[in-house]
């Protein structure tokens, strides 16, 4: 999306804040319905970030697959659960929550320090990609495949990790 710098920066900060608030809602809300809606909000913010970075196909796939199908499936499964156990006796902080938050915070800071200490200028991107895309012999679906396996490989993998975490969380909530 071709926006002026300040508007682009504002939208980036706004969507990033939405991601943080939604992620905290997924983790901290005691009611699984509210947590599932918060997950839907996070997935919509991710698709809007893809629109902001001019990858409209990935944004549409994000909305259709994750928000439209997976999140609706999670909400549908949570609706069948007995919700009386969530409305009574809610402890805000337990020992297991403290240990988990300590481990997650340690992993977060180690990832941040690794990202900041890595020289990203030495990463060599493929030069053959531009030559392949300039040819008219490649169809649109092949171009999408090339972009997903080169330019958008990291966001594509991050989406799959988010889906895996969401499904594991939904299964663990359903088993309780």
From Swiss-Prot:
EC number(s) reported in the record: 7.1.1.-
One Pfam family recorded for the sequence: Oxidored_q3
GO cellular component, one term: chloroplast thylakoid membrane
Keyword Protein transport annotated: no
Keywords per UniProt: Chloroplast, Membrane, NAD, NADP, Plastid, Plastoquinone, Quinone, Thylakoid, Translocase, Transmembrane, Transmembrane helix, Transport
Ranges annotated as spanning the membrane: 10-30, 32-52, 61-81, 92-112, 152-172
Reactions accelerated catalytically: a plastoquinone + NADH + (n+1) H(+)(in) = a plastoquinol + NAD(+) + n H(+)(out); a plastoquinone + NADPH + (n+1) H(+)(in) = a plastoquinol + NADP(+) + n H(+)(out)
One example GO MF annotation: NADH dehydrogenase (ubiquinone) activity
Bilayer topology term: Multi-pass membrane protein
PANTHER family: NAD(P)H-QUINONE OXIDOREDUCTASE SUBUNIT 6, CHLOROPLASTIC (PTHR48479:SF1)
Assembly mode: NDH is composed of at least 16 different subunits, 5 of which are encoded in the nucleus.
Family per similarity comment: Belongs to the complex I subunit 6 family.
Name of this protein: NAD(P)H-quinone oxidoreductase subunit 6, chloroplastic
The organism of origin for this protein: Lobularia maritima (Sweet alyssum)
Taxonomy of the source species: Eukaryota, Viridiplantae, Streptophyta, Embryophyta, Tracheophyta
Gene that encodes the chain: ndhG
């Amino acid at each position: 999306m071709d926006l002026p710098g300040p508007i682009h920066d504002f939208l980036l900060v706004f969507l990033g804040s939405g991601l943080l608030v939604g992620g905290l809602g997924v983790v901290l809300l005691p009611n699984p319905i509210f947590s599932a809606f918060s997950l839907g909000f996070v997935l919509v913010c991710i698709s809007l970030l893809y629109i902001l970075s001019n990858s409209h196909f990935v944004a549409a796939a994000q909305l259709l697959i994750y928000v439209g199908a997976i999140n609706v499936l999670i909400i549908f499964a949570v609706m069948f659960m007995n919700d009386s156990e969530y409305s009574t006796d809610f402890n805000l902080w337990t020992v297991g929550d403290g240990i988990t938050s300590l481990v997650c915070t340690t992993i977060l800071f180690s990832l941040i320090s690794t990202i900041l200490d890595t020289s990203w200028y030495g990463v060599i991107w493929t030069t053959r990609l531009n030559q392949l895309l300039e040819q008219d012999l490649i169809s649109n679906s092949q171009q999408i495949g090339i972009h997903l396996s080169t330019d958008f490989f990291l966001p594509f993998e991050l989406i799959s990790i988010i889906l895996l975490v969401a499904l594991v969380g939904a299964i663990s909530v359903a088993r309780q």
